Every structure is written in C-alpha cells, then in structure tokens.
C-alpha cells in the first residue's frame, strides 16, 4: 500500500541557499537510486523563503525504510536538521483523489 507524506520545516534565513543545495542533492539521489520512491517534490515558500515543504510517495514500507536509511538522507539530516528553527514536521496522509495514475 503506498505511503504519502509531507515534511515541513523552516531554516535560519542565512542558511536558505545551503539548504536548497542539500535538498537538490537529496532529490537527485532519490531520482537515481530509489525507484520505489515514486514522487518527491521539494518546494520553497514564496512569501517566507526560509520555509520548505517536501511531498513524498513511497510504494510501500520497504521503500520508505530504504529512503530513511540511505546515505543521502543521512547527509541531509546532518546538514539541514541543525539549521531548522523547529524539528521537521512529518505527516502521513491517505490518498483521496488524484489526476495521476
């Protein structure tokens, strides 16, 4: 059963560019190495550029565990987590409707 999640966080304003680089590295890893992470969208808020939201879809629990234990996720944790103003908020969702297959 697919797992849908979001991750929301805010970093110190001085760390926005560094955070964007870390996000791009993580997403590139997901794209090339995690075939069962079937959706990964990382967004930056327009009005408050230090706020970010990621939208994720994992094919199953194994795909989620693969993502969480990847070297790229570990690197993201090391570089971004210390820069957040509050802990990253992860939420899991149930899909109600979509235009995507």
Predicted regions located by residue number:
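An amphipathic, aromatic/His-enriched active-site/gating alpha helix that lines ligand/cofactor pockets
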Residues: 25, 29-39, 57-91
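Short, well-ordered beta-strand segments in beta-rich or mixed alpha/beta enzyme
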Residues: 3-10, 39-70
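Glycine-rich beta-strand-turn "strand-cap" elements at beta-sheet edges
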Residues: 2, 39-50, 76-101
């Amino acid at each position: 059963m697919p797992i849908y999640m979001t991750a929301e966080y805010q970093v110190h304003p001085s760390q926005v560019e560094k955070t964007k680089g870390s996000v791009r590295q993580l997403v590139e890893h997901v794209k090339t190495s995690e075939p069962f992470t079937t959706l990964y969208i990382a967004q930056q808020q327009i009005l408050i550029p230090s706020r970010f939201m990621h939208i994720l879809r994992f094919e199953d629990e194994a795909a989620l565990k693969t993502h969480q234990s990847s070297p790229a996720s570990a690197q993201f944790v090391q570089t971004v987590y210390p820069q957040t103003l509050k802990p990253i908020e992860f939420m899991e969702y149930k899909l109600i409707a979509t235009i995507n297959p």
